[in-house]
Amino acid sequence: MAVYTDITDQELEAFLEGYDLGAPLAFKGIAEGVENSNFLLETEKGRYILTVYERRVKAEDLPYFLNMLTWLADRGYPSARPIPTRSGATLSSLRGKPAAIVEFLPGLSVRKPTAAHCREAGEGLAWLHLAGEGYPGRRANDLGQAAWSPLFSKHRKAAEDLKPGLSATIDNDLAQLSLMWPRNLPTGTIHADYFPDNVFFQSNGKFAAAIDFYFACDDAYAYDVAVTLNAWCFEADGSFNITAAKALLNGYERRRPLSPIEKEALPILARGAAMRFFLTRLADWGSTPAGALVRPKDPLEYERKLAVHREGLVLFA
């Protein structure tokens, strides 16, 4: 989450006239993430999150995301239910940009996940995959494997500026991923951005909720697991924590056992997931607006993860 669009008190009051939430009592920006402008909103009727959609989020995709949040909440999954306007719409407009209000979810994210957190996060991810079954909305993964080479072609110079010689290494990775990418895996609704800052825990360390579904799409469940392994199971020194990874997979399989083909595919999926986040961080590196309350994330963190995955992971003995 982040803040790119500033909202005045007068603009907020006019916007809230479209909702049955009472008068605003408190309002502040949330300076995390890189995608949208997010605000913590407190009104006479409770606490909420107001999001103004920016950058990569396409307006035509927003009904998919918001309807999915409602679908998940209706099925008992702890996701932020969208709040409808007085006319029943979940999508509105603020400062000429799409905007929505969702429920505030209790819980806290963790900066240094333990193996126990990883186990809980894994189970929460499997719960999400099961709760999403049957969701009628459809959205292709526009940051999936087919998008990586075109995206890199736009940012080759940035890669060389970061690390001379890196573009040739990435070219080789992309060629190998294209040849080795698994097909025909079980698919459905995935989160695609299930990072520690998008998962909340209760005070006792139990899974509480998942947030920030704005990369959600239809893709392989095991790819979502691979994204999560990369996000949760690397140490600050760049080493892969196999204990945390096995805990995460154990938690996932408490609710949804992985099939043999999914287990076999995980190492190459993890390499591809590292490529995806390297490339989007590379794209963000030179394009974050000046003055935004957020710093772009380091692409080289995911280049180092790519280097680990080139050696191959042994996740299942």
UniProtKB/Swiss-Prot annotation:
Annotated pathway? Amino-acid biosynthesis; L-threonine biosynthesis; L-threonine from L-aspartate: step 4/5
Q: Which domain of life is it from?
A: Bacteria
State which Enzyme Commission number(s) the record gives. Answer: 2.7.1.39
Alphabetical UniProt keywords: Amino-acid biosynthesis, ATP-binding, Kinase, Nucleotide-binding, Threonine biosynthesis, Transferase
Q: Which GO terms describe its molecular function?
A: ATP binding; homoserine kinase activity
The answer to whether keyword Disulfide bond applies is no
Record GO biological process: threonine biosynthetic process
- Which positions make up the signal peptide? none
Top-level enzyme category: transferase
Enumerate the catalysed reactions. Answer: L-homoserine + ATP = O-phospho-L-homoserine + ADP + H(+)
Family, similarity comment: Belongs to the pseudomonas-type ThrB family.
PANTHER family in UniProt: AMINOGLYCOSIDE PHOSPHOTRANSFERASE DOMAIN-CONTAINING PROTEIN, AMINOGLYCOSIDE PHOSPHOTRANSFERASE DOMAIN-CONTAINING PROTEIN-RELATED
- NCBIfam families the record matches: PRK05231.1, thrB_alt
What is the protein's name according to its record?
Homoserine kinase
Query: What is the protein's species of origin?
Result: Caulobacter vibrioides (strain NA1000 / CB15N)
- Its gene? thrB
